[in-house]
């Protein structure tokens, strides 16, 4: 499975990438620190899954979901993650495949990956 990560916290994004590659044998195609750079990665790679942080410096991740279909043609599943549980319902309403709360629990991530 091919993955792109968009998270403005460089260390969190790198830790997630390492976990996805080592524990789940996923191919992380890139990690962007903002939505604009993330769009470039999505256009270039057409991943199967996007791990998207809600709080980004240039746009709210929840608003970013609305723009994704033009870039992924509906083929990319979005897994959002956030430290704020009040965003969970909105993320699902915006068609997120799943939502994880930070810090990401590996048991919860196991469940998401298996789906």
Regions found by a protein language model. Give the residues of each.
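Conserved acidic carboxylate
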Residues: 7
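Non-catalytic signal-transmission and effector/linker regions of two-component phosphorelay proteins
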Residues: 1-2
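Two-component/phosphorelay signaling modules centered on CheY-like receiver
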Residues: 10-30
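CheY-like receiver
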Residues: 37-115
């Amino acid at each position: 499975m091919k993955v792109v990560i968009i998270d403005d916290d460089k260390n969190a994004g790198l830790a997630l990438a390492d976990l996805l590659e080592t524990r789940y044998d996923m191919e992380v195609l890139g990690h962007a620190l903002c939505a604009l750079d993330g769009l470039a990665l999505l256009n270039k790679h057409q991943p199967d899954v996007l791990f998207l942080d809600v709080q980004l410096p240039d746009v709210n991740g929840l608003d970013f979901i609305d723009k994704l279909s033009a870039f992924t043609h509906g083929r990319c599943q979005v897994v959002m993650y956030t430290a704020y549980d009040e965003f969970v319902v909105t993320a699902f309403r915006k068609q997120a495949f799943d939502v994880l709360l930070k810090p990401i629990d590996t048991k919860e991530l196991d469940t998401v990956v298996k789906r």
